[in-house]
């Protein structure tokens, strides 16, 4: 081992960012109150930030329910805030992120995908374009690429081959980002879902043998 880097950023982060940018508009994201104030961004980020315990606790707190009811009353588009209230009452954050994940996977092969979301008595259909997904996941993607280049810099050598694993390694967008950062270095993949566990098991064997 000549170098290593790491950060808690992965597939969930891609799904969360895509859900935030592409799926929260029908729930009031980007709308205003009757007095012209923008709806608070955190009310649309916190319910889908499923890997952030603090954000989840804030959104699903009893105090926040009062804030959501107030925003619903003051909203120019109250029907959208009614859906956000349903996210609170029915704990829909995980299902929204799951819909984003399904769209992300579909957009690996197609230019557009439709996310179908059941909320209240409606079945919402939200179209997501591949270009919109690329823009939505730019922040976590950039973090991942920075980790790759940092590891190469610390190691002081260009790798002979890059091994990508984990579910997100299937994404052509991430693979293209790695190829751009390290051109002319071949990328290989193993078991997308088993390699991480196998690697951890082997390292545990080294540590606790």
Put a short name on every predicted segment:
Residues 85-93, 121-152:
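Adenine-nucleotide phosphate-binding core of ATP-dependent small-molecule kinases
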Residues 4, 110, 118, 165-167, ...:
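Generic beta-strand/beta-sheet core signal
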Residues 1-119:
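Phosphate-binding glycine-rich/basic clefts of nucleotide- and phosphate-handling proteins
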Residues 31-37, 47, 151, 155-167:
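Short glycine-rich phosphate-binding loop at a beta-alpha junction
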Residues 8-9, 175-202:
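Conserved phosphate-binding/catalytic loops in two-lobed NTP-binding clefts
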Residues 99, 103-106, 135-162, 177, ...:
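Phosphate/ATP-binding catalytic cores across multiple sugar-kinase/actin-like superfamilies
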Residues 88, 92-93, 157-178:
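Glycine-rich phosphate-binding loops at beta-strand->alpha-helix junctions
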Residues 20-29, 180, 184, 202, ...:
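Short, well-ordered loop/turn and helix-capping segments at boundaries between secondary-structure elements
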């Amino acid at each position: 081992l000549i170098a290593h880097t790491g950060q808690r950023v992965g597939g969930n982060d891609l799904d969360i960012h895509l859900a935030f940018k592409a799926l929260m508009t029908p729930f009031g994201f980007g709308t205003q109150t009757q007095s012209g104030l923008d709806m608070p961004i955190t009310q649309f980020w916190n319910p889908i930030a499923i890997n952030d315990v603090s954000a989840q606790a804030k959104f699903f707190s009893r105090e926040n329910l009062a804030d959501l009811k107030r925003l619903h009353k003051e909203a120019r588009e109250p029907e959208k805030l009614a859906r956000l209230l349903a996210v609170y009452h029915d704990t829909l954050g995980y299902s929204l992120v799951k819909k984003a994940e399904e769209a992300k996977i579909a957009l690996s092969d197609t230019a557009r995908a439709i996310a179908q979301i059941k909320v209240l008595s409606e079945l919402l259909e939200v179209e997501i374009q591949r270009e919109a997904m690329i823009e939505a996941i730019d922040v976590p993607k950039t973090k991942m690429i920075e980790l790759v280049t940092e590891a190469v810099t610390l190691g002081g050598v260009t790798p002979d081959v890059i091994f990508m694993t984990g579910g997100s390694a299937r994404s052509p967008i991430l693979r293209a980002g790695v190829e751009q950062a390290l051109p002319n270095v071949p990328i290989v993949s193993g078991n997308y879902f088993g390699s991480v566990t196998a690697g951890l098991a082997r390292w545990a064997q080294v540590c606790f043998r």
